[in-house]
């Protein structure tokens, strides 16, 4: 029952409670658990082990589909309800308790079938035909719940060595070593036999007195019979060397113990997959390794993923030269392991919070989205995809594990944004939503090029916030060439300001017109991807929000810096000693009111990352303990973060 999915459990419990009725029998589809294993083959494969489950001899059909079903039919489901109603009192009138205890009486046995690719009504019953799956599929796995601890009485690694010996291949090298081991044991048996005879002599003499007329009946010996396989069990200890000393395994860190244990376990499982020299390996061999990153630091995770393929490859070859085909699957929540993996090998799995279904996607499918029929556009898209692969694997692999994402322009926002998130959570707490810093949010620096990531945003389907600049400019006739029009940066409030130079804004909203952005309401800054023409469209329920500077306290900023300066003049009054990244001359002019925030931001900032750090260094808590109380978050960023928090 615990294997039933949430929807099936809910349906069965509601049905037994009388809150749901079944469809008519002719429309009813059996309920339960279904698993289908799809196997592809070609003419180069050895089909001897799968010949019994091949359903179609047509060369065009190269599929084997193994189906496993645990289902309840209409009549059995009706009987289930009737029986529950009769016995409900014994189960506290709780359908869940009855189903846990009795479901097996109605679902019956697990059906194992080989079905036709395009017609499931055509199948071979594997149990009825007595077809053994052992020769077709062999699946081994290393669970995430490993028994590695560093308690003194734990001997996980030591116990694994005895198991390794028991499962070792019958290779010439192994046989030779085993024979040498047995030879030494026989010598030891002779020595121990003499010692045992002396140890047990007293009791043996007493036994002999009961021999009567046939002394030979009670003439016993105590012999040593050391068994080479059993001897290792409980009698081997893995030690690790530290300088000139050997220390017990539990003295080592959990990370190293976990890594060594996995290597031991891989050796054991691969031995099972290879099988003995007298047996043929299964046609399909699958090895699952769950969350190898447990207890390990990033560098160790890099070492693991960089070496695991070679380790598995070495273990695929048997002593007789047979090379087993192996598919290995590693599940992970580690961005470090993903960063060191081949991009095309990665599968992305995401659970939908509404339907509770898990959607699986291959990252190599993303490449097809960065292609076009137009040659020029195709070249641009392919270069973007190449950059995206490099950037994600080298810098931001954690994006694959995020529930939400923020795309920012640069270092300034990256440094100060977590503080802004914490400040918003403290000043504007929500009873319904988790604080921003408690949510799984990834922050990605993209400059003014968030459009490069738009197909990835769509592919991942995660709620995303783009924080960018309005980058306003005006068109001015060139003094020397009247036919040339120059773009000149200016405040958005400049009467001559007409356009934005921000490529991201132009890409998402399809216009450079400045008035469009100045008048755009916050709700209209949300976007969804249109399936019709594959472009982003305004949608107040969209999962992508693009925010930029807006008018605040009578001032319309062009960039993050002048937006911050315009509302945080009291903080800057701490002076040049507190903000050495700001040019003293321009800082004094701004504090004296001789220039506005725009001119100060354009001329007075020496280092933007240093400025962000200085903002944090000069932050003060208020009397209530709320941090960062002596400065304010620009409105456009605050609105965006509050939207993302919901």
What is each of the regions a protein language model found here?
Residues 1, 233, 239-394, 425, ...:
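Switch/communication elements of ASCE P-loop NTPase nucleotide-binding domains
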Residues 138, 285-286, 404, 464:
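The start of beta-strands in P-loop NTPase/AAA+ ATPase cores
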């Amino acid at each position: 029952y615990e294997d039933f999915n949430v929807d099936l459990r809910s349906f069965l419990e509601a049905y037994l409670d009388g809150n749901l009725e079944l469809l008519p029998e002719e429309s009813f589809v059996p309920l339960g658990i279904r698993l289908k294993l799809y196997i592809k083959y070609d003419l180069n494969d050895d089909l001897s082990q799968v010949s019994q489950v091949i359903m179609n001899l047509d060369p065009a059909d190269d599929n084997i589909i193994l189906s496993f079903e645990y289902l309840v039919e209409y009549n059995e489901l009706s009987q289930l309800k009737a029986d529950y109603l009769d016995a409900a009192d014994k189960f506290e009138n709780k359908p869940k308790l009855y189903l846990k205890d009795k479901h097996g009486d109605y679902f019956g046995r697990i059906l194992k079938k080989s079905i036709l690719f395009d017609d499931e009504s055509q199948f071979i019953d594997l149990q009825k035909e007595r077809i053994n799956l052992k020769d077709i599929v062999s699946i081994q796995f290393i669970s995430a719940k490993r028994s590695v601890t560093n308690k003194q009485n734990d001997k996980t690694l030591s116990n694994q060595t005895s198991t390794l010996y028991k499962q070792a291949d019958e290779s010439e090298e192994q046989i030779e070593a085993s024979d040498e081991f047995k030879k030494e044991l026989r010598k030891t048996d002779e020595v121990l036999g003499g010692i045992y005879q002396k140890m047990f002599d007293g009791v043996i003499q007493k036994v002999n007195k009961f021999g009567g007329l046939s002394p030979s009946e009670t003439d016993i010996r105590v012999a040593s019979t050391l068994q080479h396989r059993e001897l290792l069990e409980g009698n081997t200890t893995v030690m690790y060397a530290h300088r000139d000393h050997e220390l017990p395994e539990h003295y080592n860190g959990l990370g190293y113990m976990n890594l060594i244990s996995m290597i031991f376990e891989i050796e054991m499982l691969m031995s099972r997959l290879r099988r003995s020299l007298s047996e043929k390996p299964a046609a399909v061999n699958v090895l699952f390794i769950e969350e190898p990153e447990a207890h390990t630091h990033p560098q160790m995770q890099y070492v693991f993923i960089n070496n695991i393929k070679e380790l598995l490859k070495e273990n695929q070859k048997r002593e007789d030269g047979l090379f087993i085909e192996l598919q290995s699957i590693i599940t992970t929540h580690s961005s470090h392991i993903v960063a060191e993996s081949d991009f095309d090998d990665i599968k992305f799995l995401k659970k939908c919070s509404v339907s509770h279904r898990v959607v699986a996607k291959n990252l190599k499918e993303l490449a097809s989205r960065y292609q076009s029929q137009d040659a020029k556009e195709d070249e641009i898209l392919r270069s973007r995809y190449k950059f995206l692969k490099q950037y994600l694997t080298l810098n931001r692999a954690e994006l694959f594990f995020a529930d939400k994402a923020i795309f920012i322009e640069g270092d300034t926002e990256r440094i100060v944004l977590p503080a802004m998130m914490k400040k918003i959570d403290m000043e504007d707490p929500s009873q319904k939503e988790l604080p921003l810093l408690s949510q799984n949010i990834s922050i990605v620096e993209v400059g003014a090029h968030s459009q490069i990531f738009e197909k990835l945003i769509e592919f991942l389907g995660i709620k995303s916030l783009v924080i960018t600049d309005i980058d306003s400019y005006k068109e001015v006739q060139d003094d020397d060439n009247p036919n040339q029009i120059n773009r000149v940066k200016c405040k958005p409030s400049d009467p001559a300001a007409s356009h934005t130079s921000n490529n991201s804004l132009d890409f998402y909203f399809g216009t450079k017109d400045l008035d469009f952005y100045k008048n755009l309401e916050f709700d209209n800054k949300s976007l969804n991807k249109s399936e019709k023409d594959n472009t982003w469209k305004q949608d107040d329920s969209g999962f992508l929000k693009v925010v930029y500077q807006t008018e605040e306290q009578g001032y319309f900023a062009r960039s993050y810096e002048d937006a911050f300066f315009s509302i945080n003049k009291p903080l800057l009054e701490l002076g040049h000693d507190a903000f050495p990244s700001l040019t003293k001359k321009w800082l004094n002019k701004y504090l004296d009111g001789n220039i506005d925030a725009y001119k100060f931001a354009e001329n007075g900032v020496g280092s933007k990352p240093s400025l962000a750090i200085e903002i944090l260094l000069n932050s003060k808590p208020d009397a209530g303990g709320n941090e960062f109380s002596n400065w304010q978050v620009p409105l456009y960023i605050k609105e965006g973060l509050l939207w993302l928090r919901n």
